[in-house]
Amino acid sequence: VRILLVGPRESGKLKIANYLEKTNSQPLKKVANIMYYRRTILVPDSYLESPWMHKHVIALQQTASCGIFLQPVTAKRHSYPPNFAKVFRIPIYGIVTYHKSYEESALQQAKAQLLACGLEQVDLVLDLEKEELHQIEQIILGRGRENGEF
């Protein structure tokens, strides 16, 4: 399983990638290009912000089993183009991320942004400060991974 991680700044991509890669001793570092790891493909936020780079993100589905679109509650601007998720043939999961706390209006705005990008539902609201990252595995295993292997 290789997961495509896409999200704007402050969405927690690196923290989630570190968890999925199980890199306790040497954490992954932020870089300006696409990084392929054992379990994840990490897309820099600059690829999402630039319309000219969207085609490269779309092409990454060829090497991924599924994708996760992250949306932080703190983001004010629309990160994803309309119906962007509908271009992908692999399963795409929507996750709203936050640190410690959030306002209900900000949460609703983040969910609306994920739905506007073509996702049918928001799969998880995730606190990056708590030890809730295991819920990502449960969502992926729960929707199509019957063999229990991650």
Predicted features along the sequence, with ranges:
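Conserved nucleotide-binding/hydrolysis micro-motifs of P-loop NTPases
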Residues: 47, 74-76, 99-103, 129-131
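Short, well-ordered alpha-helical microsegments
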Residues: 13, 76-80, 133
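Switch II of P-loop NTPase G domains
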Residues: 40-86
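Charged, alpha-helix-enriched surfaces in structured cytosolic catalytic cores
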Residues: 11, 15, 52, 105, ...
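Conserved beta-strand/loop subsegment of P-loop NTPase cores
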Residues: 64-71, 88-99, 112-127
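Canonical P-loop GTPase G-domain recognition
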Residues: 102-150
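Conserved G1/Walker A P-loop phosphate-binding module
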Residues: 1-43
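Short amphipathic alpha-helical segments
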Residues: 18, 80-83, 106-108
